[in-house]
Amino acid sequence: RALHHLPRIQARNLHGDRLAGNRFAYALFDAGEIRITDLSDPWAPKTQRFPAGKQPYDALVTPDGRYYIAGLFGEDGLALLDTWQPEQGTRKILSGYGRGQEPLPVFKMPHLRGWAIAGGRAYLPAIGRHEVLVVDTGTWQEVGRIPVKSQPVFVMARPDGRQIWVNFAFPDYSEVQVIDTLSGKVVKTLSPGKA
């Protein structure tokens, strides 16, 4: 079967994840949208569009598949879409988390797949800051900040969720810090070499 019968879907600057039920969620940087395309019938895909904010990039789907979260390159904050209730549309979370502070230059944009979710909390890199943000995944409200050595890029959980490992952008890309999730403090700094 030829695929030329399928409708064209803009794919430039697309960042997506597979959802349950042959659905695919993706963010369109240029269009400022999050879309969910249901491919249950590959000959008649159905696409839902949701305004997301300025320049959505990259994304994360929570481990339970419920929430799709896109970063917003053009503004502080993130766009959250409940994929179990998409008719509610997107909502902004962590809006203005950098407001009132002088941001640092950004050397590397963090990837949302490089976030950690452990123990009902999301740990994410604060863009242009020397911090890891801690967010309650029940409310999607910020509940803390953990100071780290430099600008974090990837924030990954140990499989049991007891520790979070953080690597950094230039010039500190040769170091990794380990955060204890109970205390919310850096407990070790490793120097494995340039990444």
Segments predicted by a language model, with ranges:
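Predominantly soluble domains enriched in secretory-pathway, periplasmic, or organellar proteins
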Residues: 1-195
